[in-house]
């Protein structure tokens, strides 16, 4: 929402929902909710919170390219390239991060921490403490 408020261009916002099971089984990725607009011949910007292995994003980009947009550009807040398994083009990256589990600013762990106004690192001890609550 912060990003959208700071873009001073006419745009149409669409949301997609992608499901993935496991990190290395690309065949277990599927689109649960697709864009509701015809994107043929139109520029598309994909906004991602975090790009990790790149497998889901690669699937998404192939899915969108099949709809023949004029261009597809990816903007990612966080890039965890150390875990990359699929080469994906990132047009814009906010921050490169190490291989740590991050939470806050929309990122969650078990439905928790998504509402934090900042991004933090979840240490290995914290999930155990949450499970005991």
List where the protein language model places each region:
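PRPP-associated nucleotide enzymes
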Residues: 1-133
